[in-house]
Every structure is written in structure tokens, then in C-alpha cells.
């Protein structure tokens, strides 16, 4: 449960394509870390001419130890002013992180209707497979997102660590019954610090030694 690896690559690519210019608010399901060290994120931001605030990112010097930088700081750095997180607990972080944190157990219905349809973007970066009541978790995700907003889901397909593991058609079916548009989908494969993405087609697995990788995940952008 963190923002890093291939999803981070995709987000930086989307930034170059001006995707986030239409996003003013984001809610991450889970109190997410950014899994990257200080030198790496500084270089990547400088390469893309993204302003790098050394004070905001100083906790990344701790990586892989904690406390780390929150995902909200990453979104702020991409120009998104409102970047909240939702979880059962709040991790101890740097006091520079002034973003909102909503305490909520995703096993239960979201009752605060002020949060309904509030966010331009809602993310599930390896979080919603951890609540026992996964249906309620995704119902909450739907309720948090504005009509016409975006949802990003990154979930384990092979070798995950949650209570549930998704098939390659799970999110397709969720999208179909809720009339979501699928903007992008792919598998991404992790081995050590390396990640590659491939089309969301299991036929491509014949080119990969699945015994020699860490994990396979699915990635979706829905509207």
C-alpha cells in the first residue's frame, strides 16, 4: 500500500500530458506513503521541471524507513491544491503536511454526506483489498468521486498481500455495471526495483518467467 513503482511512472507521464491540470482535489484511500528515496524523486522532478520543495520532501531521506513522505505531498507537487487521505488511523508525518486526513473504517458505510461527490480524483493504490468488506470500500470510492471525475485503481493480480486478489476482468465488470469509462488499463510487473507495463492480456504472460518476478498488478484509470 503505497505510491511508487510503475504507478508513479504513469502519474509523471500523465503530468507531462497535462492530465492533472483538470484535477483540483484528490482523495487517496489509505494513508499512503511515497516509496522513493530523496535523490531519485529530486532527479525525476528536476528532469520534468517540477518544482522540488526540499523541506516538503525531507522525509524521503528516511526511505525505506519511516516516517516517509505522504502521497498528498506528491499530489501537491503536481499542482493539485487539495489532497486528502482516508484511513482508520493517521500515520505520524512531517508537520509541513497540512493536507486533510479523514478517519474512517472502510468496512462500514460512509455517513458523512459532505464528502459525497467531493473529489475530482479518488485513488486505490493497493488499499481496498485489505478491508474485509471490499464491496463497501468500493461503494465508498464511488461516493467520494464527483460525477465526471476519475478513479485510479492499482491492485495485485499475482502475489498480493491483501485479503482479496483480483482477476483481470474484475475492474472491467465494476466499470460496466456502473457505466464508467475505462481511460487506461494495463498489467504492470515488478521485479526488485524494476517495473514494466504490458497490455491487459494474459497471453503476454507466455513471454515472462512468472517464477522470476515479485508481483503482477493491474492498473486502471476510470471516469
Predicted regions, residues:
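Short "lid" loop at the C-terminus of a central beta-strand within the Rossmann-like core
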Residues: 32-34, 156-160, 188-190
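Conserved class I S-adenosyl-L-methionine
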Residues: 150-177
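A short acidic, Gly/Pro-enriched loop at the edge of an enzyme's catalytic core
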Residues: 111-122
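A short glycine-rich, Lys/Arg-flanked "PGG" loop and its adjoining helix->strand segment in the class I
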Residues: 135-150
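Conserved S-adenosyl-L-methionine
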Residues: 179-191
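Core SAM-dependent methyltransferase catalytic element
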Residues: 194-223
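Hydrophobic adenine-recognition pocket in adenosine-nucleotide-binding enzymes
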Residues: 106, 124-130
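Class I SAM-dependent methyltransferase SAM/SAH-binding core
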Residues: 25-111
Amino acid at each position: 500500500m503505497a505510491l511508487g513503482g510503475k504507478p508513479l511512472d504513469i502519474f509523471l507521464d500523465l503530468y507531462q500530458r497535462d492530465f492533472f491540470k483538470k484535477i483540483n482535489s484528490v482523495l487517496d484511500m489509505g494513508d499512503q506513503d511515497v516509496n522513493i528515496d530523496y535523490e531519485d524523486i529530486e532527479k525525476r522532478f528536476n528532469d520534468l521541471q517540477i518544482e522540488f520543495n526540499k523541506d516538503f520532501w525531507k522525509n524521503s531521506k528516511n526511505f525505506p524507513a519511516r516516517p516517509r513522505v505522504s502521497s498528498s505531498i506528491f499530489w501537491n507537487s503536481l499542482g493539485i491544491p487539495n489532497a486528502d487521505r482516508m484511513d482508520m488511523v493517521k500515520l505520524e508525518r512531517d508537520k509541513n503536511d497540512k493536507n486533510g486526513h479523514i478517519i474512517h473504517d472502510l468496512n462500514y458505510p460512509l455517513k458523512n454526506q459532505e464528502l459525497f461527490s467531493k473529489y475530482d480524483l479518488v485513488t486505490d493504490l493497493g488499499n481496498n483489498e485489505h478491508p474485509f468488506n471490499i464491496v463497501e470500500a468500493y461503494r465508498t470510492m464511488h461516493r467520494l468521486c464527483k460525477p465526471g471525475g476519475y478513479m485510479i485503481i492499482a491492485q495485485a493480480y499475482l502475489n498480493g498481500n491483501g485479503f482479496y486478489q483480483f482477476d483481470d476482468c474484475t475492474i472491467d465488470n465494476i466499470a460496466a455495471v456502473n457505466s464508467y469509462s475505462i481511460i487506461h488499463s494495463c498489467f504492470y510487473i515488478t521485479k526488485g526495483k524494476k517495473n514494466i507495463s504490458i497490455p491487459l492480456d494474459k497471453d503476454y504472460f507466455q513471454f515472462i518467467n512468472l517464477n522470476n518476478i515479485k508481483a503482477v498488478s493491474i492498473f486502471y484509470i476510470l471516469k
